[in-house]
UniProtKB/Swiss-Prot annotation:
Pfam family, one: MutS_II
Protein function: This protein is involved in the repair of mismatches in DNA. It is possible that it carries out the mismatch recognition step. This protein has a weak ATPase activity.
CDD domains per record: ABC_MutS1
Segments of this protein annotated with the region Disordered: 796-816
UniProt-listed GO biological process terms: mismatch repair
Nucleotide-binding in keyword set: yes
Cystine crosslinks: none
Protein name: DNA mismatch repair protein MutS
Molecular function GO terms recorded: ATP binding; ATP-dependent DNA damage sensor activity; damaged DNA binding; mismatched DNA binding
Keywords noted in UniProt: ATP-binding, DNA damage, DNA repair, DNA-binding, Nucleotide-binding
Keyword ATP-binding: yes
Matching SUPFAM superfamilies: DNA repair protein MutS, domain I, DNA repair protein MutS, domain II, DNA repair protein MutS, domain III, P-loop containing nucleoside triphosphate hydrolases
Binding site for ATP: G613, P614, N615, M616, G617, G618, K619, S620
């Protein structure tokens, strides 16, 4: 810390506070501005595009300074938070009029990306999460907190791979890790990673602080007593939240134990490829959520996003949701609920801000309106006979006393902040009414005084006025000032006038100004009392908000089922996936032509479909729609199919499309192989696997070998697999693997032009139509003509020079010995001695890389 004796008293105060918050930008309140100094000022000037100036000198050097008006701070804070910065808000808490030396200041709040609660700093349709991890290479404890809702969960996870996939699903704004962990760990590649002292993760201290927070003797009631690593992480989160909020956290009431085994697991690649709530460009258009989410409230949209990203395997829960949707569809009952739900607003986040004691007047007005809408909503729910809907109705309840309290207390359209008053209704508090009357009647008193003084003095140019610096005054032009009565006391001299005060005006000033400040203080005290009364009802109100969000999602899914022609899927015990007339829910909405629906049948006898057909023929769409139908079924939704019957799945894997991972130093092919390896290691006989064009990122023979081996391994695993390929050699797989079948997407060629029919038919495709697709894409005609010449030559000589020709329109022989027989290389001898059935996919991959180094 710098030698404070060299600096001014105010800068000494600044350095002491800044020393306590070295990692945050310090917003230091000075009058109507937040000022930043030294390195903070330089950084803020660059990030916020504000002017960097200098303020005098301290310690013999000019002080770099940048400032922003306090009333427009929100916009600047939002920008800093989006950039991943944290800000310490330092306010004046002393009275400048009575302070000896610098006004007393203290940090009242720390705003970080993971702990923001202000409405203006949040995306209303996305959760804003804070996470912490503790553990080693084998087992990790993960804790997750949403301070804007009060949701607090823990789980224990095996291995980095599973942990990173879970972090990708959660996408926390901040991630806390122990400071004694080695540098360069995989988790540190994520945004918002902050290292915390190891003792913040102490498990005994964490257990004690969590029990204290929840008012319990132990954590057994939450089912996480033995999750010691996760409890250590949760303790760190709780301490961090208290440190940043500088207040109690009454809205954090419980801890939930999440279990991966309860969910359908999707890795990061699968989530990206299926474009659940973010498309491949990073936007939200044309995603699954953009089609199925028409929720009335923001809190329901956030719940919908959580459902989509964390499908369930609990059949009882899923069927209860289905039953609720069916009930809401009967006689279009959802239409009676949705207008009422729209009145509820974002109750979840409003209640969190009340718990944090930073709720604004408009939050209380929205809560008032929400509570007023509950009785009508309850009446609309009385006819809903589905058990789950009845349980939600019971949880929602009504709060007539709170509704009446807020209706009496808060004006219809309150200001944004309590700072200047004008929030509490007249008639709510007699003392406030009296003080406000004194202040409001000042105008009439001054008019009466001016008229009386004009009459008494005979001076027609006399005026009575007020300004914030000098208070009330009587003003006379300079030429008439000498005629002022003896009881006029000179207060201020202006260029062309003199200002006076009288004992009567001074007495009124003392009373009026005192009344104004006392009225504001009284109003703020009443507002704080309101918050305290609401905090006393926080637990049932939060339960109601959760139930209302779920009701909104279910009503939304009923509306979507009606308007998107979705039907109820049926879960069965025996292993199968049967879809009749399935459709892609997103593609269907953006097409200008009717979508071609297709069937799919996988069961105990058929576990894999090898899908062939032309590029643009619809293979990827067919695969993705299958995954989306299965996923929608596993959130309890109806699905885009005429009929769907399925068993529960444990994972959904997709290997569809790849691009270079430049940041990670991985080529497209390496990304593809990493995704393939993940699938081969983790798929089970209850998984759904989509494999699109495996092996296309390398040479023909390498790619074919890998695709073949991967398909065989998945066939042995008996995972439900859709395997799209342009390697026609793979269409002979059903001969050696009885659980494999061929299907193809059909097309036809007319006058050298291709027409895609998009129907899925049994059997392999007859040709690939590659040149026709190239022509359709606009490849120049001379290039297409030259390509046809090359194709004719290759069809007679094959690859690379001397391979036997094949009949046009028939698949090449799939036997690898034939394909490689003409290549004079030692690797072929080794390959001929290997039985593919005796080696694992991993061994095949290692051999392939070794051979490639030698070729």
């Amino acid at each position: 810390m710098t030698d404070l004796s060299q600096h001014t008293p105010m800068m000494q105060q600044y350095f002491k506070l800044k020393h306590q918050h070295p990692d945050q930008l310090m917003f230091y309140r000075m009058g109507d501005f937040y000022e930043l100094f030294y390195e903070d000022a330089k950084k803020a000037a660059k990030l916020l595009d504000i002017t960097l100036t200098a303020r005098g000198q301290s310690g013999g050097k000019a002080i770099p300074m940048a400032g922003i008006p306090f009333h427009s701070a929100e916009g600047y804070l939002a920008k800093l938070v989006k950039l991943g910065e944290s800000v310490a808000i330092c306010e004046q808490i002393g009275d400048p009029a009575t302070s000896k030396g610098p006004v007393e200041r203290q940090v009242v709040r720390i705003i970080t990306p993971g702990t923001v609660s202000d409405e203006a700093l949040l995306d209303e349709r996305r959760d804003n999460l804070l996470a912490a991890i503790l553990g080693d290479e084998r087992l990790f404890g993960l804790a997750v907190l949403d301070i804007t809702s009060g949701r607090f969960s823990v789980q224990e996870i095996k291995g980095w791979e599973t942990l990173l996939a879970e972090l990708e699903r959660l996408n926390p704004a901040e991630l806390l890790i122990p400071d004694d962990w080695p540098q360069g760990l995989p988790a540190e590649k994520r945004r918002g990673v902050r290292r915390r002292a190891p003792w913040d993760f102490d498990r005994d201290s964490a257990h004690k602080s969590l029990c204290q927070q929840f008012g319990t003797q132990d954590l057994k009631g939450f089912g996480c007593q033995n999750l010691t690593l996760a409890i250590g992480a949760a303790g760190c989160l709780l301490a961090y939240a208290k440190e940043t909020q500088r207040t109690a956290l009454p809205h954090l009431r419980s801890l939930r134990h999440d279990r991966l085994d309860d969910t359908v697991i999707l890795d990061g690649a699968s989530r990206r490829n299926l474009e659940l709530d973010i498309n491949l460009s990073g936007g939200r258009e044309n995603t699954l959520q953009s089609v199925v989410d028409r929720c009335q409230t923001a809190m329901a949209s956030r719940l919908m996003s959580r459902w989509l990203n964390r499908p369930l395997r609990d059949r009882a829960v899923l069927e209860a949701r289905q039953e609720s949707i069916a009930c809401l569809l009967e006689r279009y009952r959802f239409e009676n609920l949705q207008p009422q739900l729209k009145e509820i607003g974002d109750l979840e986040r409003i209640l969190a801000r009340i718990g944090l004691r930073n709720a604004r007047p408009r939050d209380l007005a929205r809560l008032r309106d929400a509570l007023a809408a509950l009785p009508d909503l309850q009446n609309a729910m009385t006819e809903l006979e589905a058990p789950h809907l009845q349980a939600l109705a019971t949880t929602i309840g009504t709060y007539p006393e709170l509704a009446e309290l807020l209706a009496k207390a808060i004006i219809d359209n309150p200001p944004a902040v309590i700072r200047d008053g004008g929030v509490i209704k007249t008639g709510y508090d007699a003392e406030l009414d009296e003080l406000q009357a004194l202040s409001e009647n000042a105008g009439q008193f001054l008019m009466d005084l001016e008229a009386r003084e004009k009459a008494r003095t005979g001076l027609p140019n006399l005026k009575v006025g007020y300004n914030r610096i000098h208070g009330y005054f009587i003003e006379l032009p300079r030429v008439q000032a000498e005629q002022a009565p003896a009881d006029y006391i000179r207060r201020q001299t202006l260029k062309g006038a003199e200002r006076f005060i009288t004992p009567e005006l001074k007495a009124f000033e003392d009373k009026a100004l005192s009344a104004q400040s006392r009225a504001l203080a009284r109003e703020k005290a009443l507002y704080e009392e309101l918050l305290e009364r609401l905090i006393g009802h926080l637990a049932p109100l939060q339960d109601s908000a959760s139930a209302l969000a779920e009701l909104d999602v279910l009503a939304n899914l009923a509306e979507r089922a009606l308007n998107l022609d979705l039907n109820r899927p049926r879960f069965v015990e025996h292993t199968c996936l049967h879809i009749e007339q399935g459709r892609h829910p997103v593609v269907e909405q953006v097409l200008e032509t009717p979508f071609v629906a297709n069937d799919l049948a996988l069961d105990a006898d058929t576990r894999m479909l090898v899908i062939t057909g032309p590029n643009m023929g619809g293979k990827s769409t067919y695969m993705r729609q299958t995954a989306l139908i299965v996923l929608l079924a596993h959130i309890g939704s109806f699905v885009p199919a005429a009929r769907c019957e399925l068993s529960l799945v444990d994972r959904i894997f997709t290997r569809i499309g790849s691009s270079d991972d430049l940041a990670g130093g991985r080529s497209t092919f390496m990304v593809e192989m990493s995704e393939t390896a993940n699938i081969l290691h983790n798929a089970t006989d209850k998984s759904l696997v989509l494999m699109d064009e495996v092996g296309r990122g390398t040479s023909t023979f390498d790619g074919l070998s890998l695709a073949w081996a991967a398909a065989e391994d998945l066939a042995r695993t008996r995972a439900f697999t859709l395997f799209a390929t342009h390697y026609f050699e793979l269409t002979v797989l059903p001969e050696s693997q009885p659980a494999v079948a061929n299907v193809h997407l059909n097309a036809t060629e007319h006058n050298e032009r291709i027409v895609f029919l998009h129907h899925v038919l049994p059997g392999p495709a007859s040709q690939s139509y590659g040149l026709a697709v190239a022509q359709l894409a606009g490849v120049p005609t001379p290039v297409i003509q030259r390509a046809r010449e090359h194709l004719k030559r290759l069809e007679t000589t094959s690859l690379p020079h001397e391979m036997p020709s094949q009949q046009s329109g028939k698949p090449a022989s799939p036997m690898q010995s034939d394909l490689f027989a003409s290549l004079p290389h030692p690797v072929i001898d080794e390959l001929s001695r290997i039985n593919p059935d005796d080696i694992s996919p991993r061994q095949a991959l290692d051999l392939l890389y070794a051979w490639k180094m030698r070729v």
